[in-house]
Amino acid sequence: MMQEGIKAIKILYLKYKSMRKAITSIKEGVIISTRNEHSILLSKYGQDNVLKIAQLHHDHNFKKKYIKDFREKYTKIDYFVLLTEQLKEEIETFIKEKNTDMKCVVIPNFLDVNEFSEKNFEKEKTVIAIGRLHPVKGFDRMLRIWEKISKKHPEWQLKILGGGEEEEKLKMLVKELHIEKSVNMMGMCNHDIVIEELEKASLYMMTSYSEAFPFVLIEAMMAEVPVVAFDVRVGPKAIIQDGENGYLIEDKEEEKFIETMEYIMSHEKERVIMRKKCVKKAEELCEDVVMEKWVSLIENSRKMK
């Protein structure tokens, strides 16, 4: 056991040494880091003539370690790229007076619109949910909510795409709730199948307890699928325009969630109107739009170096 621990420490040290060497060897240009530990090294060892950009691809969730690092160990980072405006505002509050040189900017992930067919989508009475079957994703409460919905809407199906540690537990819950006929747990699916199922679905259901920037919601909107989601701390609110391309439900308000789902499931005309607004939102996050933000950031910043 001790030998394994020593071996792991050696590997980590060699990775650290290799990363430090790579960073110091770059005399000019741009370095973009996507992990906290790498961003710390970039701040410490990056050359003055190098544009140093850090990214955060998840919610910091107010963890003291992250906040301390942003304030004290990112001081030579030029730009910190965040996924949402809310994360940007929070981090700016954390670092003020401690890290005054680093600038925070918002650049979301982009969507490849070419993955989707150009034909008119033929929608089915299907609600879809996609993600890893992990406790934080809230699939347990999704099934309990669906159990109540399915009693009034037996003609609708819930399809869950994804695998993970809770798969067997959730399958057991489906049986306990007697919703086997209306729930299809499809397991892990390749991306082509995910897109195909999105194109057929009429609604997307998200019951996560925590999210960062749920990219799957952008994919849903490109497939003209309105979303109903709990308004957790960050994530869904950055994508969903309440009442326009979906609905945000106050977290834990399960009865309101059920009521909203039943309303939209019963009103096809409303869904059709929302579908067009979904596409408009998704197009704001297409590759060309997002890449232009990156190009602009890098080109304008290098002029100042």
Regions found by a protein language model. Name each.
Residues 226-230:
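Short hydrophobic beta-strand element within catalytic cores of glycosyltransferases
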Residues 256, 263, 270-284, 293-296:
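A short, well-ordered alpha-helix in the C-terminal region of glycosyltransferases
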Residues 86, 110:
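Carbohydrate-associated surface elements
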Residues 209:
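Aromatic "clamp/platform" in nucleotide-sugar-dependent glycosyltransferases that forms part
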Residues 171-189:
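Nucleotide-activated donor-binding/catalytic signature segment of Leloir-type glycosyltransferases, i.e.
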Residues 241-243, 247-254, 263-268:
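Conserved acidic donor-binding segment of nucleotide-sugar-dependent glycosyltransferases
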Residues 188-189, 196-201:
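Short alpha-helical donor nucleotide-sugar binding micro-motif in glycosyltransferases
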Residues 125-154, 158, 165-172, 255:
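A conserved mid-protein helix/loop that constitutes part of the nucleotide-sugar donor-binding site
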